[in-house]
UniProtKB/Swiss-Prot annotation:
Gene that this sequence comes from: ZAT12
Gene Ontology cellular component terms for the protein in this record: nucleus
Main subcellular location: nucleus
Disrupted gene: phenotype observed: No visible phenotype under normal growth condition, but enhanced tolerance to heat stress and increased sensitivity to salt stress.
Keywords: Metal-binding, Nucleus, Repeat, Repressor, Transcription, Transcription regulation, Zinc, Zinc-finger
Protein name, as recorded: Zinc finger protein ZAT12
Remaining remarks: Plants overexpressing ZAT12 show thick and dark-green leaves with round shape, short petiole, elevated amounts of anthocyanins and enhanced tolerance to high-light irradiation and oxidative stress.
Source species of the chain: Arabidopsis thaliana (Mouse-ear cress)
GO biological process, one term: response to chitin
Family annotation (InterPro entries): Znf_C2H2_sf, Znf_C2H2_type
Alphabetized GO MF terms: DNA-binding transcription factor activity; transcription cis-regulatory region binding; zinc ion binding
Induction cue: By H(2)O(2), cold, drought, cold or heat stresses, wounding, cucumber mosaic virus (CMV), exposure to high-intensity light and low-oxygen conditions in roots.
Bilayer-crossing regions: none
Amino acid sequence: MVAISEIKSTVDVTAANCLMLLSRVGQENVDGGDQKRVFTCKTCLKQFHSFQALGGHRASHKKPNNDALSSGLMKKVKTSSHPCPICGVEFPMGQALGGHMRRHRNESGAAGGALVTRALLPEPTVTTLKKSSSGKRVACLDLSLGMVDNLNLKLELGRTVY
């Protein structure tokens, strides 16, 4: 049989332990039983408190050093621009200029895909939408357009489009 005084002392000790644990809520562990994990960089041995911080730091080892750029050890990046021969707009890459040149080409395929400027093309007709009695929008097209006579296709650069 267990004595009543023994049970009473066990309850008192348990209650005291609970009160001591509750009094430490929000404080760092002093006894070192559950230490925070430390993440160390394998390159420079710098320590971080989170894996994400270590990952961001590790990425900095992969970037080129700014000191090498300032001392001129790295090759100088050539900054060239590619101007459009028709309208003069400049592009940083030749590929962008090639995409831009499509704007100057005749999209209808007439004149063999030659370059034309928009100022020399006839004004496009605007299609108006009207509501019919049923409430639907209907496009009104003017089919009585005449041929464009004497269209001068001489470009500003002196080349003639055939």
